[in-house]
C-alpha cells in the first residue's frame, strides 16, 4: 500500500508531524468545549437547579465519551505502530477490526448505563435535582452508541494522518449544537431535555458524516471491506491494552468529578456544585490546546516506537510539552485579565447571578491548575503511543484521583477551609501529580536511548 501525502507527513519530521496533527485537533476540541460551555450558559438561564443537574450527569457522560476515546486511542496506537514498522496490511486490518469493536462495546455500554442511571444519580447526591438530572441524562444514555462511535472512529483517521476527517465532523457537530440549543431549550420549551436532544442530533450528524466517508464515498486511506471478515482477538487485545486504560482514565476523571461534587455539596450545597460545573468547563476549554497537542503525540510517538526510532520519541515529547506550555500560559492570562467579563456570561439572569462573584475569584488563580497539565498530559499520551496503557493509567490515577481527592478532602473538610479549600486542593493535587508524570516519561525515554546506544 503506497503512502499518501498524509502518511508521508506523519512519518517524517516529528515536530512537523506534531504540528500537523495538533492544530486541527485543538480547533475541534475548543469548538466542542465552547459548545459545552454555551450549553451551560443556555441552561443557566433555567436556574441553578438545572445547571447543577448537568453537573451531576456530566461525569457519567464523560465516561461514555471516554470509552470512545479509549477505543480511538487504542486503535491510533496500534495502527501507528504498524505504520512505523511498515506493515500496511496489518494497519488496514486493525482499522477494519476497530469498526466492529466500537459497535460491540457501544451495545454493551448502552445496556449497562440505562440500568444504572437512576441509582447512580442517587449515590452521587443528586436528590435535590433528581428529576432534572433524569430528564437530561436518560436520552443521552439510551443513545450511547451515537456518542461513542464518532470519537472511536476519529482515532482511525488520526492514525492515517487524515486530520481533516478526524476533526471536521466534530466541528460541524459542535456548531450545529450551538444553533439547536436555544431552539430546543426555549423555542420548543423543552427545557433541560431539549439540551440533551440537541446534543444527540448534532452528534448523530457527526457519525453519519464519518460513515459516509468510510462506506459510501470510500476514498479513505484504509479500505473498509468485510468480505471474509473474522474477529481478530489478538488485535482486540492490543487495542484494548491501550483502550481500556485510556477509557479508565476518563472513568477516573468522572469518579473524581463525582467525589469532588460530593465534597462541594457538603461544604457549599447546590450553588457550590453549580459553580464548580461552570469553572471546570472553563478550565476544560483552557487546557484543550494542551490536550490536543498531547493527543497528537499518540500517533507520532507510536510511529517512532514502531520504527524503533527512540530519538524521535524524545523530540516529539519535548516539542509537545513546549507547545503545551505556551498555550497554557496564554489561556491563563486570558482568564486572569477577563475574569469579571467571563463570570458575567453566567449571571445574565436573576436565577444565576449568585454564582458570578465566586467564578470571578476562582479564575484569578486557576492558572496554577492549567499550566501543570502540560506536563502530566504529555507524559500520559506519550506512554499510550508506545502501547504502555497501564503506565499511562497509573500516572493519571495518581494525578487526577488519589492526590486531588486527598487534598480537596483535607483542605475543604478536614481543615474547614470550605469551598476555597476544595479549589486549593484541586490545584495542589494536580501540580504534584503532573510533576511525577514528567519525571516518569523523562526516565523512560532516557532508558530507551541508553538501551539503543548500547
Regions found by a protein language model. Give the residues of each.
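Short runs within selected transmembrane alpha-helices of multi-pass transporters and secretion channels
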Residues: 72, 139-158, 166-177, 195-210, ...
Amino acid at each position: 500500500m503506497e503512502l499518501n501525502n498524509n502518511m508521508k507527513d506523519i512519518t517524517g519530521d516529528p515536530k512537523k508531524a506534531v504540528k500537523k496533527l495538533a492544530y486541527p485537533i485543538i480547533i475541534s476540541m475548543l469548538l466542542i468545549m465552547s459548545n459545552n460551555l454555551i450549553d451551560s450558559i443556555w441552561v443557566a438561564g433555567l436556574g441553578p437547579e438545572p445547571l447543577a443537574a448537568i453537573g451531576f450527569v456530566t461525569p457519567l457522560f464523560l465516561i461514555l465519551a471516554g470509552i470512545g476515546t479509549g477505543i480511538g486511542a487504542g486503535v491510533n496506537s496500534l495502527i501507528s505502530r504498524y505504520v512505523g514498522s511498515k506493515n500496511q496490511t496489518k494497519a488496514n486490518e486493525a482499522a477494519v477490526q476497530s469498526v466492529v469493536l466500537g459497535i460491540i462495546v457501544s451495545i454493551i455500554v448502552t445496556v449497562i448505563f440505562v440500568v444504572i442511571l437512576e441509582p447512580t444519580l442517587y449515590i452521587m447526591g443528586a436528590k435535590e435535582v433528581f428529576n432534572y438530572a433524569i430528564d437530561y441524562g436518560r436520552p443521552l444514555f439510551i443513545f450511547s452508541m451515537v456518542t461513542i462511535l464518532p470519537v472511536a472512529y476519529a482515532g482511525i483517521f488520526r492514525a492515517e494522518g487524515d486530520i481533516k476527517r478526524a476533526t471536521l465532523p466534530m466541528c460541524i457537530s459542535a456548531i450545529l449544537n450551538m444553533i439547536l440549543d436555544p431552539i430546543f431549550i426555549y423555542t420548543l420549551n423543552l427545557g433541560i431535555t431539549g439540551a440533551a436532544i440537541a446534543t444527540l442530533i448534532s452528534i448523530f450528524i457527526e457519525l453519519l458524516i464519518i460513515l459516509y466517508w468510510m462506506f459510501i464515498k470510500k476514498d479513505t486511506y484504509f479500505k473498509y471491506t468485510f468480505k471474509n471478515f473474522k474477529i481478530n482477538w489478538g488485535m482486540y487485545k492490543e487495542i484494548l491494552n491501550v483502550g481500556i486504560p485510556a477509557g479508565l482514565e476518563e472513568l477516573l476523571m468522572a469518579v473524581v468529578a463525582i467525589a469532588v461534587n460530593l465534597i462541594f455539596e457538603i461544604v457549599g450545597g447546590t450553588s457550590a456544585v453549580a459553580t464548580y460545573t461552570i469553572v471546570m468547563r472553563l478550565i476544560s476549554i483552557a487546557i484543550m490546546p494542551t490536550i490536543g497537542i498531547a493527543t497528537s503525540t499518540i500517533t507520532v510517538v507510536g510511529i517512532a516506537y514502531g520504527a524503533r526510532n527512540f530519538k524521535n520519541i524524545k523530540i516529539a515529547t519535548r516539542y509537545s510539552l513546549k507547545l503545551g506550555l505556551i498555550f497554557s500560559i496564554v489561556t491563563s492570562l486570558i482568564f486572569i485579565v477577563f475574569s469579571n467579563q467571563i463570570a458575567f456570561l453566567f449571571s445574565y439572569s436573576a436565577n444565576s447571578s449568585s454564582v458570578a462573584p465566586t467564578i470571578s475569584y476562582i479564575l484569578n488563580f486557576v492558572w496554577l491548575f492549567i499550566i501543570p497539565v502540560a506536563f502530566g498530559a504529555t507524559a500520559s499520551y506519550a506512554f499510550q503511543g508506545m502501547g504502555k496503557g497501564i503506565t499511562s493509567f497509573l500516572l493519571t490515577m495518581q494525578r487526577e484521583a488519589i492526590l486531588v481527592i486527598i487534598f480537596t478532602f483535607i483542605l475543604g473538610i478536614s481543615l474547614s477551609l470550605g469551598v476555597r479549600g476544595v479549589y486549593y486542593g484541586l490545584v495542589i493535587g494536580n501540580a504534584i501529580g503532573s510533576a511525577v508524570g514528567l519525571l516518569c516519561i523523562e526516565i523512560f525515554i532516557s532508558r530507551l536511548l541508553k538501551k539503543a546506544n548500547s
